[in-house]
């Protein structure tokens, strides 16, 4: 079965790319290993650098309807409030605020925008990637059940343990004309590393004791032995995520099985939180409709984001910690730039490899910068930046940094807003 673009992975990045391909008339097929779209994760943060692209494909109205804009972030050290960071200026400056939204609902909406079952094959686990042996051929994948798909371009959106990334590396390392099939069990130099931390997160039912004054207020809680963030969501729901050192002997898994409310309470149940009815976080955890525990990985080396007719996006290319909520946003940025490139390939198919190299060069520096930024912010937030000076540096930043400092620090992040090539062409026509 052939198509213009084969996308391996039906997460945020893969489905965003598929929705954009559909928008510009490029045929695609998404292969997702999960058998169903089940709730995975808790919440998601969508910032201005991703929202402009979502606005272009008609998804911003959904985000506005189902999400909650963040107005302020209150920073606490144990029970003492250090500061309140204003976020209401973001929309005036960048055109969009930061939204917190329930992840599964947003994922389902992306699935629909991508074309649903007409585009997305669920239960389609890739076992082998077969690169082209001649320039005119496409790239093929073979599923575990034996089905075979071929595309003019193959895109890896399959996360930190990407089978497509291994195929891309094999394409780079093999002599011309000798690149063979690459399977999921092939040995390859690992480019991701376990950070030693586990994220404990959850998404609550509406908290009836919260009122209008609580809308849009996030909390950064800096405890002695852990940290915790609560993000406001629609209808006074809360998305919480904490980070603690992991005690696992085997860090080779991403999502823990059998995590429950007690998993969260063992770490955070007795900790102070300003909006908990008795000021203990267990009173929030008991309202969680689901909880998740997952190990945290980040990128250590960066393979090229494109080689031959294979391209990468999101965590498959630049896995990062979630300390500033940019993982999904960067996948959306990647998808926007890649969709623009795929639109060009649709017009000039013989230039596919050259055009993908253009995508590679437009995204690699940005992705690497975000990995470094996320790592450094994690060090700042946990009081470990600059070694023994870490606690002092953290307190100085969170208690003394003026608003103009935050505006300066976030300009490079939120001011970068990729646009789909279709929209660029329309803008050029209007100004011509």
UniProtKB/Swiss-Prot annotation:
It comes from the Eukaryota. The gene is pynG. It is an enzyme of class 1 (oxidoreductase). It comes from Aspergillus niger (strain ATCC MYA-4892 / CBS 513.88 / FGSC A1513). GO terms for biological process: secondary metabolic process. Its cofactor is FAD. FAD binds at residues 32, 103, 315, 328. This is FAD-dependent monooxygenase pynG. Its EC number is 1.-.-.-. The lineage of its organism: Eukaryota, Fungi, Dikarya, Ascomycota, Pezizomycotina. FAD-dependent monooxygenase; part of the gene cluster that mediates the biosynthesis of pyranonigrins, a family of antioxidative compounds. The first step of pyranonigrins biosynthesis is performed by the hybrid PKS-NRPS synthetase that condenses 6 malonyl-CoA units to an acetyl starter unit, to form a 1,3,5-trioxotetradecane-6,8-dienyl-ACP. The enoyl reductase (ER) domain of pynA is likely to be functional during the first two rounds of polyketide chain extension, to generate the saturated C-C bonds of the alkyl side chain. GO terms for molecular function: FAD binding; monooxygenase activity.
């Amino acid at each position: 079965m052939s198509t213009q673009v084969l996308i391996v992975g039906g997460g945020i990045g893969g489905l965003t790319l598929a929705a954009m391909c559909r928008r510009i008339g490029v045929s695609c097929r998404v292969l997702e290993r999960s058998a169903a779209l089940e709730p995975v994760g808790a919440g998601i943060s969508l910032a201005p650098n991703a929202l402009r692209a979502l606005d272009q494909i008609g998804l911003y109205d959904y985000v506005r309807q189902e999400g909650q804009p963040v107005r302020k972030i209150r920073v606490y050290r144990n029970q003492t409030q250090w500061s309140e960071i204003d976020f209401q200026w973001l929309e005036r400056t960048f055109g969009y605020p930061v939204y917190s939204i329930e992840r599964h609902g947003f994922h389902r909406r992306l699935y629909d925008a991508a074309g649903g079952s007409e585009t997305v094959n669920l239960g389609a686990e890739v076992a082998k990637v077969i690169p082209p042996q001649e320039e005119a051929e496409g790239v093929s994948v073979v599923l575990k059940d034996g089905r075979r798909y071929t595309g003019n371009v193959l895109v890896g959106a399959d996360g930190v343990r990407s089978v497509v990334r291994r195929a891309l590396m094999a394409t780079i390392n093999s002599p011309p004309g000798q690149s063979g099939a690459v399977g999921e069990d092939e040995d390859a130099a690992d480019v991701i590393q376990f950070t030693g931390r586990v994220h404990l997160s959850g998404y609550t039912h509406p908290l009836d004791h919260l009122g209008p004054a609580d809308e849009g207020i996030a909390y950064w809680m800096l405890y002695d032995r852990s940290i915790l963030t609560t993000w406001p969501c629609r209808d006074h729901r809360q998305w919480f995520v904490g980070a603690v050192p992991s005690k696992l002997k085997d860090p080779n898994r991403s999502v823990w099985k059998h995590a429950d409310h007690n998993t969260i309470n063992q770490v955070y149940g007795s900790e102070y939180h300003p909006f908990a009815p008795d000021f203990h976080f267990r009173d929030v955890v008991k309202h969680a409709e689901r909880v998740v525990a997952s190990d945290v990985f980040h990128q250590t080396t960066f393979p090229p984001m494109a080689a031959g007719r294979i391209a990468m996006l999101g965590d498959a290319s630049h896995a990062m910690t979630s300390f500033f909520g940019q993982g999904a946003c960067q996948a959306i940025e990647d998808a926007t730039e890649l969709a623009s490139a795929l639109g060009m390939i649709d017009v000039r198919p013989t230039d596919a490899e050259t055009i993908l190299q253009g995508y590679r060069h437009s995204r690699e520096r940005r992705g690497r910068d975000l990995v470094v930024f996320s790592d450094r912010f994690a060090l700042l937030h946990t009081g470990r930046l600059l070694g023994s000076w870490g606690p002092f540096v953290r307190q100085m930043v969170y208690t003394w940094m003026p608003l103009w400092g935050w505006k300066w620090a976030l300009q490079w992040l939120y001011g970068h807003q990729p646009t789909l090539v279709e929209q660029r062409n329309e803008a050029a026509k209007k100004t011509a």
